[in-house]
A protein has these predicted regions:
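Short, positively charged low-complexity motifs
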Residues: 1-16, 22-43
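Active-site mouth loops of central-metabolism enzymes
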Residues: 80-96, 140-152, 206-222, 300-313
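Conserved, mostly hydrophobic/aromatic
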Residues: 84, 112, 161, 230, ...
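Active-site-adjacent beta->alpha loops and helix N-cap segments on the catalytic face
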Residues: 70, 93-94, 120-131, 150-156, ...
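Active-site pocket-lining/capping segments in soluble small-molecule metabolic enzymes
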Residues: 185-210, 260-312, 317, 348-358
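Short, acidic/polar
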Residues: 91-104, 126, 152-158, 219-229, ...
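Active-site beta-loop-alpha junctions enriched in small/polar residues
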Residues: 85-88, 115-119, 143-149, 174-175, ...
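N-terminal amphipathic alpha-helix/helix-capping segment at the start of soluble metabolic enzymes
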Residues: 65-83, 90, 356-358
């Protein structure tokens, strides 16, 4: 990395550090709420899952530093629900995505992840949408892929994220752009190479894992070895690929813990609103479709309204079961559909209320 780029990253980190102190104001009955530079989160009883809002007794403090890093949010120990969005494709309008993001932010997720466009379609748009998420007071998790990248391109993109206030990066291998010639994979052949590259620069780093084994890996045990390498290189948390059978996840989680993977594991849940789409996704990814859920898709897959109802109900049931069994972090693949997130969060309202915060 060129010294001047490294210096810019460090300067941006220092500015961010200086701006991470948020004022607290009295808001009735001895409850305080947090404000930050991009706006104000005001609520007499904000949801516990809201990452940007913490309650304090006024006698305890008047000012507090609130972390937007996912590792700190997960360490809080409360049930956590996060959403995933994808940026507009190259030259596509921003407004529909920004509108969806704004609606999702009103559900007070713990964070929102923003995917990384392939083949140059939306890499710059990832930064723009992540910045918009941050402006709404929600921590952003920016996806970053490394296959085909160079030291310079990684430095440039991480600097852009840092300047946008993004502190969380999901480190992924990704795929080579279709127009790349053979041998242009670059110095970052695996996600672990990206983790090692980024670890010194103070980002909170996440990774991906596959309860049913990565499609390119022959054996689950080998896949777990690769995951452990990424964790040892510096991952702070891991998010799973979607699954539709919680028992598969529980067995996988047990294997990870037995093999020394101790970082938080976020369970990835996809509410299915399109029967034909999910059949294709499962074929490509090798995700197991339980007979109980397959019957739902077969029965309602050609009826969008019914499939939406059934998909939301099934995803809600999965999440409730996960929370009941001690899995406190769930990531919902919302596919830019705020209406899906709204319905699920309404179903979980009582569960996410939790105990009063002291």
């Amino acid at each position: 990395m060129r010294p001047e780029i490294k210096q810019k990253i460090e300067q941006s980190r220092e500015r961010k550090r200086e701006n991470k102190r948020y004022s607290l104001y009295l808001y009735g009955s001895g409850i305080t709420f947090a404000t930050w530079g991009s706006g104000v989160r005001i609520s007499s009883s904000p949801p516990v899952v809201s990452a940007g809002t913490f309650l304090y007794r006024t006698a305890q403090c008047r000012e507090v530093e609130i972390s937007m890093m996912i590792k700190d949010i997960l360490a809080y120990g409360r049930p956590s629900v996060s959403f995933e969005v994808f940026p507009p494709r190259k030259d596509a309008p921003f407004e529909p995505v920004k509108s969806a993001v704004a609606r999702l932010a009103r559900q007070h997720p713990s964070f929102m992840s923003v995917t990384y466009g392939a083949s140059g379609n939306s890499q710059a748009n990832t930064v723009a949408i992540a910045a918009h998420v941050q402006e709404l007071g929600v921590p952003a998790l920016a996806h970053l892929t490394c296959l085909g990248a160079t030291d310079e391109s990684i430095a440039s993109e991480t600097l852009a994220l840092r300047q946008a206030g993004v502190e969380n990066i999901l480190c992924l291998r990704g795929d080579l752009p279709k127009d790349s010639a053979e041998g242009q994979a670059g110095p970052f052949l695996h996600a672990v190479d990206l983790v090692r590259k980024l670890k010194p620069y103070g980002f909170c780093l996440g990774g991906a894992c596959y309860p049913e084994c990565h499609p390119d890996c022959a054996h689950l045990e080998d896949d777990i070895v690769h995951l452990r390498e990424k964790v040892e290189a510096g991952l702070d948390f891991v998010t799973t690929q979607m699954f539709f059978d919680n028992n598969i996840f529980y067995r996988y989680l047990s294997k990870l813990r037995d093999r020394g993977v101790t970082v938080p594991i976020i369970a990835g849940i996809m509410p299915v609103a399109n029967g034909r789409q999910i059949s294709r996704i499962c074929r490509l990814s090798g995700t197991y479709l339980p007979s109980r859920f397959k019957a739902i898709v077969d029965r309602y897959g050609d009826h969008p309204a019914a499939m939406l109802d059934a998909g939301v109900a099934y995803a809600t049931e999965q999440i409730v079961d996960l929370f009941a069994n001690g899995v406190n972090a769930v990531h919902i693949y919302t596919m830019n559909k705020p209406e899906v997130a709204e319905r699920i969060m309404a179903n979980l309202k009582g569960i996410l209320g939790g105990d009063p915060v002291e």
